[in-house]
Amino acid sequence: RRQRQMCIRDRNKPVYSFSDFKGQKIRTMENSYHLAFWKAIGANPTPMSFSEVYIGLQQHTIDAQENPYEVIVSNNLYEQQDYVVETNHLPHLISLIVNDDFFRDLPEDEQEIMTEAAKIATEYAREQSDARIVDKIAKIEESGTKILTLDDQTRADIREASQSVYESIKENIDPAIYNAYMNGIEN
């Protein structure tokens, strides 16, 4: 259970298959991995300041953008498109992070307390996030915007086409961090 991140469409062209991404102008952050991901699946990634996204959708400077439901609703982005396509290409992993030196310096009983408290807090945060997502989806659907879910084959095609991006990330960060992230996605 994680907050999903997806691609938003502003025109009457829904995404049902991998080939539907080809040539689409998708607003991304100015992040080399985001740009590489969208290029790998055939889209035309367009770095753009977030403050320009609403107008970019409105004026068709961009066809789509990637954001979680919270951002879509809080910025009224759903007003400028007919479809929300749940690509789930980026998870929003809710976790508690603590300085390793600080944690190791704690007595064992306090480490156990912190570990248990972190599990409880993380579960609560995920439940709250899930509830907010349900609320945001309802608001989007009430506006007339359709929410589409990609089929397993399209997800597999995306995964295969973007594998080189993940390999690049893996080469540039600590393997333990990469593996923890990927394990979080799987679980």
Predicted segments, located by residue:
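N-terminal secretory/targeting leader peptides
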Residues: R1-Q5, R9-N187
